[in-house]
Amino acid sequence: MSGAESFVPAPMYLTDAAAQRLGALVEEEGNPGLKLRVYVTGGGCSGFQYGFDFADTVGDEDTIIENGTASMVVDALSYQYLVGSTVDFEEGLAGARFIIKNPNATSTCGCGASFAV
């Protein structure tokens, strides 16, 4: 028996609030196959930034996270920065938006759209 331990990354989560809002947006679009694509790109004031888009296709390397009938998709490169994260939806004085609570981020910008690892 070897002393090596296997590593299983923590999954990502889509909160009920985010799933409800996503469901409403998909219904407005009239395409029940749409999913929320969450991705990470270089840039922003902290080094990386989050992005959101609709996707109606899923790549071979994509990970699908579901909550009820709502689904989000994350590409393999972005997933490594988002492991263990929670995607939520909030409404407040700053407006309504999807947000990411990322335990891997060592710092974030004031608006929460960019982060550093």
Swiss-Prot record:
Cofactor annotation: iron-sulfur cluster
Q: Which residues bind iron-sulfur cluster?
A: 45, 109, 111
- InterPro entries assigned to the protein according to its UniProt record, in alphabetical order: FeS_biogenesis, FeS_cluster_insertion, FeS_cluster_insertion_CS, FeS_cluster_insertion_RrpA, HesB-like_dom_sf
One GO MF term:
2 iron, 2 sulfur cluster binding
Cofactor: record remark: Binds 1 iron-sulfur cluster per subunit.
Which biological process annotations from GO are given for this protein?
iron-sulfur cluster assembly
Keywords attached to this Swiss-Prot or TrEMBL record, sorted alphabetically, are: Iron, Iron-sulfur, Metal-binding
Whom does it interact with, and what assembly results?
Answer: Homodimer.
Stated family: Belongs to the HesB/IscA family.
Give the protein's function. Required for insertion of 4Fe-4S clusters for at least IspG.
- Protein known as: Iron-sulfur cluster insertion protein ErpA
Organism of origin is: Chromohalobacter salexigens (strain ATCC BAA-138 / DSM 3043 / CIP 106854 / NCIMB 13768 / 1H11)
